[in-house]
């Protein structure tokens, strides 16, 4: 059995999009490390099930439509009233669209950008006064390997994830004097609901994936990752082990980026 040292004991953490997938993996890891968590998500039933499964009183759920600024403001008002401070913000929430330039409507483009890029900006902005009260404030962005490479057919998602990586750098420089560290994690192929394609097939079961990534050794570890793999990287940035690290992006991708 893995021994947990509770290295985040009583740390106050907000995880956006924490009800499922990578977000749920992050919540599980951080609560096991002793953190108190607010899940900000629109998926209420999934969040409640996660809290029930973890059997803990250290998690609160705030139903939040992260595409709406007023709901983000209410989220941080709740955090202020409930805790008075925030130690760690994990900007994890994201949606994927799968459209190319020619078939992407501006409305759908903007909707993806609102959740994937605007929301991390707004959450970071409204978290700032609470993070300043912490002696070890952290902002962690969940980007993607798609934010550092060209990838056909996902224009708004890729653009937003690339923007998150540069937002990480900018905020790291801007907030260093406030002792707030800002880093990002860029997952590769992770086994979540977002890896299910429109036709219902898993991405890594398709012929094109096998040809491009396995046959030509573009995925050196030859397997997909799991939310726990990403959660471990997030924990590093939450912990004192990263106290002299800011403005960095850690790729959790099984070696894909090493083949670029």
Model-flagged regions — what are they?
Residues 124, 160, 168:
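Active-site helix of classical SDR
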Residues 102, 149-155, 177-178, 222, ...:
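Active-site loop immediately N-terminal to the catalytic Tyr-X3-Lys motif
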Residues 129, 173-177, 243:
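Alpha-helical segment proximal to the catalytic Tyr-Lys
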Residues 100-101, 105-110, 215:
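Substrate-binding pocket helix/loop in short-chain dehydrogenase/reductase
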Residues 2-4, 149, 235, 246-260:
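Short C-terminal tail/terminal secondary-structure segment
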Residues 8-36:
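Canonical Rossmann dinucleotide-binding motif of NAD(H)/NADP(H)-dependent dehydrogenases/reductases
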Residues 144:
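Residue(s) in the substrate-gating loop at a strand-loop-helix junction
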């Amino acid at each position: 059995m893995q021994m947990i040292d509770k290295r985040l004991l009583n740390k106050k953490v907000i995880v956006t999009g924490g009800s499922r997938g990578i977000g749920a993996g992050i919540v599980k890891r951080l609560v096991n490390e002793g953190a108190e968590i607010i899940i900000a998500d629109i998926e209420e039933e999934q969040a409640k099930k996660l809290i029930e499964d973890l059997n803990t009183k250290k998690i609160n759920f705030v139903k939040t439509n992260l595409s709406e600024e007023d709901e983000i403001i209410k989220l941080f008002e709740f955090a202020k009233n409930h805790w008075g401070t925030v130690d760690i913000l994990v900007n994890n929430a994201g949606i994927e669209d799968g459209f190319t330039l020619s078939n992407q409507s501006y409305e759908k483009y903007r909707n993806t950008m609102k959740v994937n890029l605007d929301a991390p900006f707004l959450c970071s902005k409204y978290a700032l006064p609470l993070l300043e009260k912490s002696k070890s404030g952290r902002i962690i962005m969940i980007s993607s390997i798609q934010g550092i490479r060209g990838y056909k057919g996902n224009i708004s998602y890729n653009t937003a994830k690339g923007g998150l990586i540069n937002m990480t750098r900018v905020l790291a420089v801007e907030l260093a004097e406030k002792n707030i560290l800002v880093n990002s994690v860029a997952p590769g192929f992770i086994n979540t609901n977002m890896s299910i394609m429109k036709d219902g097939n898993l991405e890594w079961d398709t012929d094109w994936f096998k040809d491009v990534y396995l046959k030509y050794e573009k995925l050196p570890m030859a397997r997909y990752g799991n939310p726990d793999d990403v959660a471990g990287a997030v924990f590093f940035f939450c912990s004192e082990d990263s106290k002299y690290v800011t403005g960095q992006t850690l790729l959790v991708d099984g070696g894909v980026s090493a083949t670029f």
